[in-house]
Amino acid sequence: MQHEFWHQRWQENRIGFHQFTPSPLLVDYFNELGLKTSARIFVPLSGKTLDISWLLQQGYHVVAIELSQIAVTSLIEQLVEDFDIQFESSEKNNLIHYHHPQIDIFVGDFFDLSKEQLGQVDAIFDRAALIALPDDIRQDYVQHLIEISGAASQFLISYQYDAGSHEGPPFSVNAEEIKQLYAEAYDIRLLKEQLVDASQNKGNHPKSTLWILTAKF
């Protein structure tokens, strides 16, 4: 999963993808999933996103996985500051696990995370995972995500720009590919599509799209 690439990005602090406020789409539309506030939300490839703090503030439980220890250390420092959370840590199956009753954080390769380790989740919040992966990995990512989560409902944000205008990441994933990746397991609803400030993002004519995915079975 391009370990060296992402480790280097974090070591060099080249994290322009990190947002310093919670995702506006998350804040405005997450209630479309119709979840109880005690629901457990999975955040794959989480980085140190402030979206996790927002989810916790709403009363949700969170489980996240991130490859970079640097990112997770920063995330934990922020959570300790914001919520006075103290974590217990353990290690199993190549993954470091930080546990608190309201949040679990795993450090390591997403593909090493098992269904048993993840536990039951009610929904998946994917703002930056799918679009961080090149096309030769995305199908495997989606399949593993479905397997370990039991096809939990998804709040998925994709990103699209003109072909050839940027190499990625973030990678451009269009509506046709979203359907190819998810249609077998999910009913797919396009909820919101918006243009993105090109000066702040990669690629020509960038736009973000919010999808709600609901399991067919």
From Swiss-Prot:
Gene name of the record: tpm
Any single Gene Ontology cellular-component annotation: cytoplasm
Enzyme Commission code(s) on record: 2.1.1.67
Similarity section: Belongs to the class I-like SAM-binding methyltransferase superfamily. TPMT family.
GO molecular function (one): thiopurine S-methyltransferase activity
Protein's name according to its UniProt entry: Thiopurine S-methyltransferase
Biological process according to GO: methylation; response to metal ion
PANTHER family assigned: THIOPURINE S-METHYLTRANSFERASE (PTHR10259:SF11)
Compartments it resides in: Cytoplasm
InterPro entries: SAM-dependent_MTases_sf, Thiopur_S-MeTfrase_Se/Te_detox, Thiopurine_S-MeTrfase, TPMT
Pfam families from the UniProt entry: TPMT
Chemical reaction(s) catalysed: S-adenosyl-L-methionine + a thiopurine = S-adenosyl-L-homocysteine + a thiopurine S-methylether
Binding locations of S-adenosyl-L-methionine: 10, 45, 66, 127
Native organism taxonomy: Bacteria, Pseudomonadati, Pseudomonadota, Gammaproteobacteria, Moraxellales
Entry keyword set: Cytoplasm, Methyltransferase, S-adenosyl-L-methionine, Transferase
Gene3D superfamilies named among the record's database cross-references: Vaccinia Virus protein VP39
